[in-house]
Amino acid sequence: MSKTISILGATGSIGRQTLDVAEQLGLRVAALTANSNAERLEAQARKFRPRLAVLTDEAAAKDLAVRLADTDIRVLGGPEALLEAAVCPEADTVVTAVVGMVGLKPTLAAIREKKRIALANKETLVCAGQLVMDAADTYGAEIVPVDSEHSAIFQCLQGCADRREIKRLILTCSGGPFYGMTAEEVGKMTRADALRHPNWTMGPKITVDCATLMNKGLEVIEAMRLYRLPLEQVSVVIHRQSIVHSLVEYRDGAILAQLGTPDMRLPIRYAMTCPHRADNPSEPLDLLACPPLTFAQPDRDVFPCLRLAEEAACSWRRRSAFPTSPAW
């Protein structure tokens, strides 16, 4: 179980929810980073008292240094300062909740220090998954996914020592706010429409990506990288209720699923505590009050981003080799 964490991307949706979980679990915070939100990072730093606070925007970092001048918190600015937060010696776990490829270098730096990586930055695996997974193998670092779908799969794979036992991974997808529309109707939707996700509370970029199913396409590639399986063993189903977070089908016909409320603090909590569990003050899933659970095929004509991501995954597979060992 984690005891001290660094959070890269602390002022975003995942970062803020991670701090909620850290407070509930009594975890110490060693470092906090953000892009440019000096006001919010100041408030977080004053509450959690990290050793280090970083803003990648250097002008904002100067502002933060003035704001925190009455504390003993060290303030750094610039993109390279992310690396210092990632390798902060007090932290045993690094939560990578930044957006985009900016997460790659600090993730690799944390891996080299044998940190547990609570990975919420899917772009790191999409753009350099083989590099990251090979580095984790080399340095003996643990990567625990924070995405709800990949956390579900991670949990359903506990006890599976041989990937040949897996028939397929099944990623669930809510379908977003445009589910059931025609391509013509989707084409008339606005940014505001895309930001109205029916089930999840997330940051704006991932919410828009969910509306187009681009996020699900990235998650397909992420699953291939993280679990080292070909595209033929990763499928997507529409599950409007967002109760079943993903499933694993085994070669003997058994299907394991992880269920829970649509609350990102659940996978964040598991990434902090696994392989153990901790009490959760949030309202649990009430099976008797659940709506009927439905599953359907996604429409790749209405949502071509999913198809394009799968085509990109096929192209990547032709240029890359999967590990020959069946062990993880």
Q: Where are the predicted features?
A:
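Catalytic, metal-anchored helix/loop core of enzyme active sites in primary metabolism
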Residues: 1-328
